[in-house]
Amino acid sequence: PSLEIVKEACINFEIPHNGIIFDPTLESWAKQGVLMINSALTCEVNKVGSHTMMWRPFMTKLLKNLSEWQTGIIYVLFGEQAKTLKPYINKNTNIILEEKHPAYYARQEERMPSTVFQEVSKLTKERYGEPIVWFSEY
């Protein structure tokens, strides 16, 4: 359900659109430099978060090295688990945004606000000249 929540937030159905094409593989996002990664890359079946501590050393080193070697990255930390990784991101040369995890909105049966996606697009346009295209219209 998290991807569906993200889809609704980035499309922002409060604004009228023509026909919408959303790439569920997120390949179109990857081509624009967007990487969506969880704080744990695996888990036991039906046990969300069961491998979080196993992946913790890898994720902390990944974020620390990435944020030191590549500056100007816009990090979006979704949820409390992701926010615990914030100290490993160099905030002096990168931007860190925070939002509740999409699963929170699914549990609450609420719509996730589109503000974080709008902010990423705004910052990307300011820094690199082009906003992120979260979906296509036809």
What annotation goes with each model-predicted range?
Residues 1-74, 82-89, 95-98, 104-107, ...:
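A polyanion-binding, active-site-adjacent surface
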Residues 94-102, 133-138:
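Short flexible/disordered coil segments
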Residues 107-109, 113-138:
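C-terminal functional extensions of proteins
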